Design a protein with these regions (language model features):
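Soluble metallo-hydrolase cores and metallopeptidase-like ectodomains found primarily
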Residues: 49-51, 126-135, 139-166, 229-309, ...
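Short helix-loop-beta-strand segments that form the rim/entrance of peptidase-like active sites
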Residues: 67, 325-350
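Metal-dependent peptidase/peptidase-like ectodomains
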Residues: 129-130, 145, 238-243, 248-249, ...
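His/Asp/Glu-rich mid-to-C-terminal helical/loop segments that flank catalytic regions of hydrolases
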Residues: 324, 328, 335, 440-486
Length: 486
């Protein structure tokens, strides 16, 4: 997940419903095409809903998603844009989608930025010297080889920075103290992440020589969180590092003493030339309208500190497994289900923007888009952005997922960061909320590793996307164009 589009605040869902339906037999013959509608003017027939329920139950006992994630984290690991790990991830994804039975598997080239992390450090030099656990923010420039040392000016957020006279900032190191709040819907991220995105640029405008931020995360361990910064033409670039939450507490405690506090920061990160990566695509061809597609999206890149297990290895695995199970269903959907594993979400959405540009002429044939990029946690709610007369179909799709705990939450889907580039072209989208209470403990840290992922949560997510994609691809009228699409 990038700084480009943090999750929007959404309402808190009721407690997760218990799984209640026993799995029906999977070996029955395919339903006849003339099956009776479930109700007068119902969006789906009894046969379609039964197929979706069978797919749900099969997904809930299938570990393709979990084993796909194991393979990605074991055989590739970290895969930041432009790195050797990125190239390995593209090769891995091509092989994996083929092994899962997807068709038309191919790579579409994407040019990506290439930032290389180097060693860094932050040290309290007075009044009480101590080392602090730190990482460079993505895109940070280097310090001089000997580092930078200056007095610390604490500010809570960008609003407070704007109220401070520049004379207090000039020549100093700005420390952003704001703490991210834990929330089921992840809304604390959106409120906190602006200082990571624009904190260095705004401090530089006021003469700061460096920036340190409290990690954008909800944990209390000493592994700091990285993440991308957002620069604009004309911005003066200064070094920017994140320190862990306990180290930020220590720094605040020293500041509370009333004595001047000084920091020394060293960073040796650098930029290299742009690199070649790729969006990796595979399909389950539709039985009647193969040129019309439902997109299942996730981003293949990750940050370089951990394995990228939750962000977004889980999404890659979930969407790949959902497509594989759709391909094994008794009845293939009318339209094609297309998995798109996007390049470089973390450093500016290069893959999603390239896909939207290269496929703009086919936007009308994109029937629906969905994205998984909030880890593998309990699915809680469904949002959509479709014409009002198509909402009954969305609610019928949600009803198949009620036994997993998914409620319908609103008509305000965005497609999230990557698939949102398609929503801007008028492609209808669905968003699946998951419980984000723990996600930001690991997000963008060395702790984002395979052991943090619960196989049961992977299965539930696979079930949700398999059902949603199958029904969306088989829905005869289609979903038209997204309201307010361009």
């Amino acid at each position: 997940m990038s700084v480009a589009q943090p999750p929007r605040p959404r309402s808190i869902a009721p407690a997760l419903l218990l799984l209640a339906l026993a799995a029906p037999a999977l070996g029955a013959s395919a339903p006849p095409a003339s099956a009776t509608p479930a109700a007068t003017n119902a969006p789906f027939t009894d046969a379609q809903l039964e197929e979706a329920r069978l797919l749900r139950e099969r997904s809930l006992v299938d570990d393709t998603g979990y084993e796909t994630l194991r393979s990605l984290t074991r055989e590739v690991g970290p895969r930041s844009a432009g790195s050797p790990g990125d190239a390995r991830a593209v090769a891995w994804a091509l092989a994996r989608l083929r092994a899962l039975g997807l068709k038309n598997v191919h790579a579409e080239p994407v040019t990506v930025p290439h930032w290389i992390r180097g060693p860094c450090s932050v040290e309290l030099t007075s009044p009480w010297p101590q080392p602090l656990a730190a990482v460079a923010l993505g895109g940070s420039v280097a310090t001089p080889e000997a580092g930078l040392e200056a007095e610390v000016v604490p500010v809570t957020n960008l609003d407070e920075l704007a109220r401070i006279d520049s004379s207090r900032i000039a020549g100093q190191i700005v420390f952003y103290t704001g703490r991210m709040q834990r929330a089921e819907d992840g809304s604390g991220y959106g409120r906190a992440v602006t200082v990571r995105g624009r904190g260095a640029a705004e401090a530089a405008k006021r003469g700061a020589i460096g920036v340190v931020i409290r990690s954008i995360g909800t944990d209390r361990n000493r592994l700091p969180h990285t993440g991308g910064m957002r620069t604009e033409p004309g911005d003066r670039q200064i070094p920017a590092l994140a320190i862990s939450n306990p180290d930020a507490d220590l720094l605040e405690d020293q500041l509370a003493s009333g004595q001047p506090v000084r920091l020394k920061m060293i960073n040796s990160s650098s930029w290299a030339d742009s690199a070649r990566s790729a969006n990796v695509i595979g399909e389950i061809p539709g039985r009647e309208r193969p040129r019309e597609v439902v997109v299942l999206g996730a981003h293949l890149d990750s940050w370089d500190l951990g394995q990228g297990a939750h962000d977004d290895g889980a999404g890659v695995a979930i969407m790949s497994a959902a497509a594989k199970l759709i391909g094994e269903a008794r009845l293939k959907p009318r339209r094609t289900v297309r998995v798109v594993l996007f390049a470089n979400e973390e450093f500016g959405l290069s893959g999603a923007r390239t896909y939207a540009r290269d496929h703009a002429a086919e936007a009308a044939s994109h029937v629906m888009g969905m994205e998984s990029d909030l880890g593998a946690y309990a699915p809680l709610g469904l949002h959509a952005r479709v014409p009002a007369d198509r909402l009954p179909a969305i609610r019928a799709m949600q009803s198949v997922l009620a036994s997993i705990g998914v409620q319908y939450r609103g008509d305000d889907a965005s497609g999230d960061a990557d698939v949102g580039q398609l929503e801007a072209l008028g492609v209808p989208v669905c968003d699946l909320d998951t419980d984000a209470s723990e996600y930001f403990d690991w997000h963008h840290t060395a702790n984002d590793t395979f052991d943090k992922v619960d196989p049961e949560m992977v299965r539930r997510n696979v079930a949700c996307y398999a059902v949603l994609a199958w029904l969306a691809a088989d829905y005869l009228p289609g979903f038209g164009r997204a309201p307010n699409g361009h």
